[in-house]
């Protein structure tokens, strides 16, 4: 199984880099993990709705260029479906059984994802109605993917 995480912006915080590196190492027994970071656009305070859409569209274009044919795309979106850890594990298992060997998770920037990216998504996933910094979301996502693989293999961790 190949898993790609496409995110907006460069990861700068050392503690997040360390956490992501730890889950990258843990996940290596279950999947091949790839990271793609696309440039984030400057978003000044008090944007108009049109300016917000323009920024999301520009980031979205870069995201869409990174998505290859054959990838099953899961967009992280507040309007997406919430799943338990067990349900995420089942979803990943089911995708593998259906022949989807490449899952791509997409994390938007501070303004979220463009409509183009949301339309391209095969599934929209919401982790919580709360908003998280998009860089922290990458670490939370990897922890949940790791937990999903452990659940799937009936290995201790998720209790």
Swiss-Prot record:
Gene Ontology CC annotations of this record: cytoplasm
UniProt subcellular location: Cytoplasm
Keywords for this protein: Cytoplasm, Methyltransferase, rRNA processing, S-adenosyl-L-methionine, Transferase
Chain positions recorded as S-adenosyl-L-methionine binding sites: 76, 108, 127-132
GO-annotated molecular function: rRNA (pseudouridine-N3-)-methyltransferase activity
Classification via InterPro entries: Alpha/beta_knot_MTases, RlmH-like, tRNA_m1G_MTases_N
Catalyzed reactions per annotation: pseudouridine(1915) in 23S rRNA + S-adenosyl-L-methionine = N(3)-methylpseudouridine(1915) in 23S rRNA + S-adenosyl-L-homocysteine + H(+)
Residues that span the membrane, as ranges: none
EC number of the protein: 2.1.1.177
Coiled coil: none
A Pfam family reported for this protein in Swiss-Prot or TrEMBL: SPOUT_MTase
Function: Specifically methylates the pseudouridine at position 1915 (m3Psi1915) in 23S rRNA.
HAMAP family (UniProt xref): 23SrRNA_methyltr_H
Assigned protein family: Belongs to the RNA methyltransferase RlmH family.
Complex and partners: Homodimer.
Name recorded for this polypeptide: Ribosomal RNA large subunit methyltransferase H
Organism annotation: Alkaliphilus metalliredigens (strain QYMF)
Organism ancestry: Bacteria, Bacillati, Bacillota, Clostridia, Peptostreptococcales
Gene: rlmH
């Amino acid at each position: 199984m190949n898993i790609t995480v496409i995110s907006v912006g460069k990861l700068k915080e050392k503690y997040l880099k360390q956490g992501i590196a730890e889950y990258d190492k843990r996940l290596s027994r279950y999947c091949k993990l790839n990271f793609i970071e696309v440039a984030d656009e400057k978003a000044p305070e008090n944007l108009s709705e049109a300016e917000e859409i323009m920024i999301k569209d520009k980031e979205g274009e870069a995201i869409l260029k990174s998505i290859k044919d054959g990838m099953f795309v899961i967009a992280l979106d507040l309007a997406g479906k919430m799943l338990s850890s067990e349900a995420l594990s089942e979803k990943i298992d089911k995708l593998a059984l259906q022949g989807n060997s490449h899952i791509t998770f997409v994390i938007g920037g501070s303004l979220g994802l463009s409509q183009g990216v949301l339309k391209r998504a095969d599934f929209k996933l919401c982790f919580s109605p709360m908003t998280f910094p998009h860089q922290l979301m990458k670490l939370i996502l990897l922890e949940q993917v790791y937990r999903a693989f452990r659940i799937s293999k009936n290995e201790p961790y998720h209790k």
